[in-house]
A protein has these predicted regions:
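A short acidic, Gly/Pro-enriched loop at the edge of an enzyme's catalytic core
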Residues: 135-146
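A conserved beta-strand element that flanks and buttresses the S-adenosyl-L-methionine
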Residues: 146, 151, 155
Length: 281
């Protein structure tokens, strides 16, 4: 695995950080994302994006990167909303994704983060990874999981997390275990040629991306760009599409392993494909 260096200390020299948002600040985030959702929803309805996935995939190519999570979440939940859904978010230091989920109707949102967080809102809970892991071991489950630009940092120590070379793979397994059997995860990672940038982040390509996705069925990748997904460019100018994932069950894994052994599959990272796992074989 190629290695580059760009060292960042987000621990305040080991003292740790505490990000606090009072009710007024969170209400501001909520109103901002509610307005963005309303604007995007009106556009999506006018353009018929809900009923035409191909058109949605083409349209999101022209949407600024920072809005991709909003567009994809709305696309999947505009009809059913997140009403009565429990959401877990892995890695955040400000409640933008939480506000987005509340805007989509989430019942409650749990945020898992190494830094100290205080979100003063009745529907928001913050928790450290070890405590969250214990809740999962005790059988607690969530309907929806989000990890936006988070797991690529896990195990590199930038945010005070333990140094674990496979911290990102472990995080994916924890997210899978935390989901209900038919739960859905939304994931973004920097894509390109495989690279570990110590201690900034990882970039995922043909070597490590299949390992990250090996326990998942890929329902879609938005927006998908085959060329950008394997570029070996500036590691600070990242391409991070939104992967929409569902945990694989044992029967499905057994059938797909049989297909692989029989040579009945091909490798393809295209949107909606789950062949990323097959490349790992």
């Amino acid at each position: 695995m190629p290695v580059a260096e760009f060292y960042v200390d987000d621990t305040k020299k080991g003292e740790g950080t505490h990000y606090k948002y009072d009710a007024g600040a969170i209400d501001g985030y909520f109103k901002s994302y509610a307005a963005r959702l309303e604007s995007w929803r009106a556009f999506a309805v006018e353009e018929g994006l809900d009923s035409n996935r191909t058109m949605f995939e083409e349209t999101i190519q022209d949407v600024p990167k920072q809005h991709w999570p909003l567009c994809v979440l709305d696309h999947f939940f505009s009809a059913s909303s997140l009403a009565d859904k429990r959401v877990v978010i892995f890695g955040t230091m400000e409640p933008w994704a939480e506000a987005l989920c509340l805007g989509l109707g989430a019942k409650d949102v749990t945020t898992v983060e190494y830094n100290d967080l205080t979100f003063e809102h009745g529907a928001l809970t913050t928790i450290k990874p070890d405590a969250f892991r214990r809740r999962v071991e005790d059988g607690e489950r969530w309907s929806i999981a989000l990890s936006f630009s988070s797991f690529d940092h896990d195990g590199l120590g930038r945010y005070g997390d333990p140094l674990v070379p496979d911290g990102d793979l472990q995080a994916m397994k924890l997210m899978r275990k935390a989901l209900e059997p038919q739960g859905i995860a939304f994931l973004t990672l920097p894509l390109g040629q495989d690279l570990v940038v110590w201690n900034l982040h990882r970039r995922y390509g043909p070597l490590r991306l299949p390992l990250m996705l090996q326990d998942w069925q890929v329902l879609g990748t938005f927006p998908w760009d085959e060329t950008r997904s394997v570029e070996d460019g500036n590691f600070r100018q990242t391409y991070e599409p939104v992967f929409v994932l569902m945990p694989r069950d044992a029967d499905q894994e057994e059938e797909e392993d049989r297909e692989i052994d029989e040579g009945r599959v091909c490798s393809d990272f295209s949107s909606g494909s789950d062949d990323q796992r097959r490349k790992a074989k």
